[in-house]
């Protein structure tokens, strides 16, 4: 949906815009001649404070995040049951990823698909896949009761 709204705005020659539909975001052009700024929330925070700020450079960026930190239930054993299913086990994913964010240069559809796939893969395979395919990826992971933010190589090129 966000991609279609963007394409319509471009068709109408409305080049400067930020669109957010359900956490899928497109920024295009500028915000009164300044970069658009999009904050990525800390998944463990109850506030809306951002952990990372993404700014565009008067260009198009599609941003999609995926995570299991809000939309889950617990079973009788206290284990998380999430809405993302591991395609290999056909069970709810179980990994150390709290949040996945993908920034794509051309497509919100790709950003959304990659963020969901990386969430299901787990952190090591996701980061290897992103680096091998030149994809801008940020993972917020929890390990040993610590929160770490890790980035793919492309993230540093695209998100400055």
Which residue ranges define each predicted feature?
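Mature catalytic core of soluble alpha/beta enzymes
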Residues: 1-160
């Amino acid at each position: 949906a966000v991609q279609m709204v963007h394409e319509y705005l471009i068709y109408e020659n409305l080049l400067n815009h930020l669109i957010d539909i359900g956490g899928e975001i497109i920024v295009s052009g500028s915000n009164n001649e300044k970069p658009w700024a999009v904050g990525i929330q800390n998944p463990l925070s109850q506030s809306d404070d951002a952990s990372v700020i993404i700014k565009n450079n008067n260009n198009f960026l599609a941003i999609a995040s995926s995570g299991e930190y809000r939309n889950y239930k617990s079973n009788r054993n206290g284990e998380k049951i999430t809405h993302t299913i591991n395609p290999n086990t056909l069970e709810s994913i179980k990994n150390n990823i709290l949040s996945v964010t993908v920034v794509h240069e051309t497509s919100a559809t790709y950003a959304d698909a990659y963020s969901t796939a990386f969430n299901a893969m787990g952190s090591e395979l996701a980061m290897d896949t992103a680096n091998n395919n030149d994809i801008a990826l940020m993972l917020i992971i929890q390990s040993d009761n610590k929160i770490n933010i890790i980035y793919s190589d492309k993230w540093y090129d695209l998100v400055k």
